[in-house]
A protein has these predicted regions:
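ATP-dependent carboxylate-amine ligase
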Residues: 4-169
Length: 169
């Protein structure tokens, strides 16, 4: 949608949309903002969806909605920060989106996210982790060849460290 809007603005300003489209075609996602990558981690072939830079209620729900066609087998979710008194309710409200994706494993980082996932009435294995290092260890134990791993969380919660470990492997 953003790309289409950008092309419409270029057109309305009288710029060459063909040039804009060519430049847009070479655009790559910034680290932690939904980039897809494939490779091996500890000898296991995986696809990583790294959305570890930002997490709020709306961006979490939008991310879950974008995953419905090819849902991940493993989700690594860290807390949404700076939500104040509404934090518990905002985390609990994520449950339907997670349930709809039917992940095999949900690894959570942080108290609020772990509390939410522990209450999920689904067949997914829930692995709570105190920090990114523990989450990476739990991830190692569950990876299977061909898995898609989705990582989402607030930058300050450290989910990006899990993604960095996978990318650098």
């Amino acid at each position: 949608i953003n790309a289409m809007a950008m092309l419409a603005v270029c057109d309305s300003l009288g710029h060459d949309t063909a040039i804009a489209a060519k430049r847009l075609a070479s655009f790559t996602n910034l680290p932690g903002r939904g980039a897809f990558s494939s490779g091996k981690f500890d000898g296991t072939a995986i696809t990583l969806i790294d959305d570890s830079y930002n997490a709020g209620p709306a961006s979490m729900k939008a991310a879950f909605a974008s995953l419905t066609v090819n849902p991940p087998q493993i989700m690594v979710l860290s807390e949404m920060l700076e939500l104040g008194d509404g934090s518990a309710a905002a985390h609990t409200a994520l449950a339907p989106g997670i349930l709809s994706l039917r992940p095999r494993v949900v690894i959570t980082i942080g108290t609020e996210m772990s509390r939410m996932a522990a209450a999920l009435p689904c067949s997914a294995v829930h692995e709570p982790a105190a920090d990114a290092e523990a989450a990476t260890d739990r991830l190692r134990a569950h990876l299977r060849d061909g898995d898609t791993v989705f990582i989402k969380g607030s930058n300050g919660s450290g989910a990006w460290r899990v993604a960095a470990t996978l990318i650098d492997a």
